[in-house]
UniProtKB/Swiss-Prot annotation:
Its EC number is 1.14.13.81. Transmembrane segments: none annotated. Keywords: Bacteriochlorophyll biosynthesis, Chlorophyll biosynthesis, Iron, Metal-binding, NADP, Oxidoreductase, Photosynthesis. Coiled coil: none annotated. Its cofactor is Fe cation. It catalyses: Mg-protoporphyrin IX 13-monomethyl ester + 3 NADPH + 3 O2 + 2 H(+) = 3,8-divinyl protochlorophyllide a + 3 NADP(+) + 5 H2O. It comes from the Bacteria. This is Aerobic magnesium-protoporphyrin IX monomethyl ester [oxidative] cyclase. Disruption phenotype: No phenotype under photosynthesis or low-aeration respiratory growth conditions. In contrast, under highly aerated respiratory growth conditions, the absence of AcsF leads to an accumulation of MgPMME.
Length: 358
């Protein structure tokens, strides 16, 4: 595997955050008129209860650093290897970009709609994502690598997504984010000696924000049944596979990050998939068969393809570009074969909302 490119300056951190690749977090824009037309009257009781939870803001005091934070960084993180340092910094840059992406999207929606239900929801979620992004960025500043988030908002490319794509992708992003954070938190709770950075102490209450955000999109989707039935299930299937595959490949580019926490990347990812599959039964009548032999083989092949693409890119020149194109085509073919693997089907529960019980 090629060495992870180093992040040693704020300029490199900003460049990494602005990247637009298949694996990097993106910034989105959407159809605000369609967002304004969202109708949640069919799930009004659950919706109002959820907004009351946002109003209660049980994490309002959570994203504050303790006096011991910087001291723990100095004592514990100084002992990590250069390779782990770079993988962790890459994780922080990717995470702050992802959190800020949600902040930007939700804020733009709330500014461009009049629908009071949508406006209130987006304002609350933008508030939460702003806290998350700011907390991660503060951790980057400890290394002199803080990112100018205002500049990132102005200069990073935006991708247009129809509202239904926003719902599918963001629901899954929030729920898989919960599954990732809670799995890491539980692991380090059992093995505190492997907590090499204090930010992981915040993950339990933090991931409950992610879970609640996902609940919001679950309610929207269940209030519009046509989005989770018929031909739209083909899109659900696509986004399930795309989100899982992106996570799997990205995580396997950071093997030392998981190893340092006492996790193995493949085992960790399938635990996250399992949790996300269970959660997503609240809204999707299908789930990926993550135990299917062809699914697991396909994931491994996508990792190999990514390594080959990176090697071709590093080679450069005409030959390198041709190799990149060939391996990209191989990756697309692998994804297509995985898309055709039979899915598991199940009935939707009468009650939409769930508790974060993992």
């Amino acid at each position: 595997m090629l060495a992870t490119p180093t992040i040693e300056s704020p300029e490199e951190a900003a460049r990494r955050a602005k990247e637009s690749t298949l694996l990097s977090p993106r910034f989105y824009t959407t159809d605000y008129a369609a967002m304004n037309a969202i109708d949640v009257s069919s799930i009004r009781a659950e919706w109002d209860a959820m907004l009351a939870e946002y109003e209660g803001d049980n994490n309002h005091d959570h994203f504050q650093r303790t006096p011991e934070f910087a001291q723990e960084v100095a004592e514990r993180f100084s002992q990590v290897s250069p390779e782990l340092r770079q993988e962790f910094l890459d994780f922080l840059v990717s995470s702050v970009t992802s959190e800020f992406s949600g902040c930007v999207l939700y804020n733009e929606i709330q500014k461009n709609v009049e629908n009071p239900d949508v406006k209130a929801l987006m304002r609350y979620m933008a508030r939460n994502e702003s806290r998350h992004a700011g907390f991660i960025n503060q951790a980057l500043r400890d290394f002199g690598l803080g990112i100018n988030l205002g500049g990132l908002k102005r200069t990073k490319a935006y991708t247009y997504f129809k509202p239904k794509y926003i719902f599918y992708a963001t629901y899954l992003s929030e729920k898989i984010g919960y599954a990732r954070y809670i799995t890491i938190y539980r692991q380090l709770e059992r093995h505190p000696d492997k907590r090499f950075h204090p930010i992981f102490r915040w993950f339990e209450r933090w991931c409950n924000d992610e879970f609640r955000h996902g609940e919001s999109f679950a309610l929207i989707l269940r209030a519009h049944p046509h989005l989770i039935s018929g031909a739209n299930l083909l899109w659900v299937r696509f986004f399930l596979l795309a989100v899982y595959a992106t996570m799997y490949v990205r995580d396997h580019m950071r093997p030392q990050l998981h190893e340092a926490m006492g996790l193995e990347s493949t085992d960790y990812d399938y635990r996250v998939f399992q949790i996300t599959n269970e959660i997503s039964k609240q809204v999707f009548p299908i789930s990926l068969d993550i135990d299917h032999q062809a699914f697991r083989a396909g994931m491994e092949r996508l990792v190999r393809v990514k390594t080959k693409v990176d090697a071709a890119k590093a080679r450069g020149g005409l030959v390198g570009r041709l190799q990149q194109a060939a391996w990209a085509a191989a990756g697309a073919a692998t994804f297509a074969r995985m898309y055709l693997i039979p899915v598991r089907r199940h009935a939707l529960p009468a009650q939409v909302r769930m508790a974060p019980a993992w």
